[in-house]
Amino acid sequence: MQSLYSIAVLAAAASASLADMDLEFFGTEPAGDYYGSDLPDINVDDFYEKTFDNLVDHYNMQDDRTYKQRYWINDEYFNKGDKKGPIFIYICGEYRCSVPATRLYPFMLGATYGARLLVLEHRFYGDSQPFDDWSLENLAYLSSQQALSDLAYFLGAMKKEHDSEVLVIGGSYPGAMSAWFRERYPHIAIGSWSSSGVVQPIVDFWQFDE
């Protein structure tokens, strides 16, 4: 298998941004032509929606509560043989997630590597709701730290099925998450595709309005 390190380097240099994704954006032009390469389109019908029992609180060993976290999986291109394909996972951010557009470039690239393609919805968004209500007490569990641990717990389960190398992908806030994940969990992810990752967020960013 070709090394995923080369993909991580390519991702860092990629000019196309996945930030603030409209998941249909990349369906407007054939990305294979845009990038000057002959890459396969991804059929959205090959993605299957599932749920995963993730932990509500990853930092309290006495709390065994779980919630249904939504994800999508596409094994159409996955090489399960001796040369196992990698796992390419797109991290959804602060929005209701849906199946990616057919021409999402990282997934098109993943298909050429025989990758399992995954999409994970962020806790507290879409159908991935740990609680029935958004009380202040419950919203205490809405944090990047818990979301990163969600991703680690989820990928741990996926790697038990197939111990594949993992590339995490995201843009804007999920781009930051992909970079943070690679830094925090280098034993899980071999690389990170961070497009416009907000890795140094500022709470009171008053310069933005100037």
Predicted regions and their residues:
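Conserved alpha/beta-hydrolase
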Residues: 112-129
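Alpha/beta-hydrolase fold nucleophile elbow
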Residues: 162-172
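A catalytic-pocket lid/entrance helix-loop region that shapes and gates access to the active site
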Residues: 188-210
